[in-house]
C-alpha cells in the first residue's frame, strides 16, 4: 500500500517537473524579433550622393575661378613683358642698323653743320629736342655719332658754344654690362665722366646728358637737345 502511494507521488512529481520546465522553453513557432535596420538606407545613400555631387560642383567652380584668375594674371604679365621687351629692344635695333650698314657712313660730312672745339668738330643742336634714341639716329644720318667727350676741357668748350640747356651724349647702359654705363660707339666705359653728385638713381635712368658742366642720367625717352661728333670713331 505504501509502496503504491510512493510510486504514485513520484509519478505526479515527475509530471509536475515536466509541465513546469516546458513553460520556460520558448515555442518553436514563436516570432523572432525584427533585426535593426542598417543606418545607410537607400535614401541616406542618395542624400549622401547629392551632397557629394554638390560639393564637387562647388570645388570645380572654385578651381575654374582660380584658373581664370591665373590666366588673366598671366595675360597681363605677358603684355607687360612684351611692352618692356619692346623698350629694351629699341636700342638693340638701332645698334643692329648701325652694324648692318642700313645707316651708311660717309666721309662727305656737311662740315657747315659742325663747329670746331679743340681738335674735333661737333654739332650742337640748339633748337630740336629728341629722345636719346632719336638723337642717336639723327647724328648717324649726319654721318656722325652722338658725342663721346674726351675730357673736361672738351666738355667746357662744347658748353661754351651752347645755350644753358640739357644735351644727350653717347653714354648709356641700355645693353647690359653689369649695370655699367658705356659708349655705344666703343662698347666700353666712357673715357671721361663728370657726374652730378647725389643723383636719384632709378632703374629706368639709363641714358646720360650734360648740363651746366656736369653729367646726369635720365629716362631715355625724355626729350632733350643733343651733341653729335663729326668723326665716327671714339
UniProtKB/Swiss-Prot annotation:
Offer a single GO CC term for the protein.
extracellular region
**Record localization:** Secreted
- Protein name per its UniProtKB record: Accessory gland protein Acp29AB
Keyword Disulfide bond in record: yes
Where does the record place the C-type lectin domain?
137-234
- Please state the gene responsible for encoding this protein: Acp29AB
What the protein does?
Answer: Responsible for physiological and behavioral changes in mated female flies.
> What residue range is the signal peptide?
1-21
Q: GO:BP terms for this protein?
A: sperm storage
Keyword terms of this UniProt record: Behavior, Disulfide bond, Glycoprotein, Lectin, Secreted, Signal
Where are glycans found on this sequence? 29, 61, 127, 164
Task: Please name one Pfam family that this protein belongs to.
Answer: Lectin_C
Gene Ontology molecular function: any one: carbohydrate binding
Which cysteines link up through disulfide bonds? 139-228, 207-220
Primary subcellular site in the record, as a coarse category: secreted
